[in-house]
Amino acid sequence: MARIAGVDLPRDKRVEIGLTYIYGIGLSRSQEILAATGVNPDTRVKDLSDADVAALRGEVESNYQVEGDLRRLEAMNIKRLVDIGTYRGRRHRMGLPVRGQRTRTNARTRRGRRQTVAGKKKAPGK
């Protein structure tokens, strides 16, 4: 089992796809890494030699911020925006869309499930 940046890559997938299971590595970055290390993208993860895994691990850990480091960096950037009181920081703090999207309708992903508002009670009939 290939373990890179603290993530176990799925054994039966191609290396090109398997690398995308690491937070911070998408398909294009995966292709860059494979080109830099000279590993064939069509190779299955289970067929990688120890040397290939070591080369991939070295490339990822030396040249890219991934997993915990990247998550920490993103959290620090958001915290900085909140601390200095920017508009974007306020939107993050309030849990609303940050990039100018409308909120009168939509924005459900960012705002969460719709909360039920109690309606007017009907008067008891006579």
Curated annotation (Swiss-Prot):
GO terms for molecular function: rRNA binding; structural constituent of ribosome; tRNA binding. The keyword tRNA-binding applies. Coiled coil: none annotated. HAMAP family: Ribosomal_uS13 (MF_01315). Located at the top of the head of the 30S subunit, it contacts several helices of the 16S rRNA. In the 70S ribosome it contacts the 23S rRNA (bridge B1a) and protein L5 of the 50S subunit (bridge B1b), connecting the 2 subunits; these bridges are implicated in subunit movement. Contacts the tRNAs in the A and P-sites. Part of the 30S ribosomal subunit. Forms a loose heterodimer with protein S19. Forms two bridges to the 50S subunit in the 70S ribosome. This is Small ribosomal subunit protein uS13. The gene is rpsM.
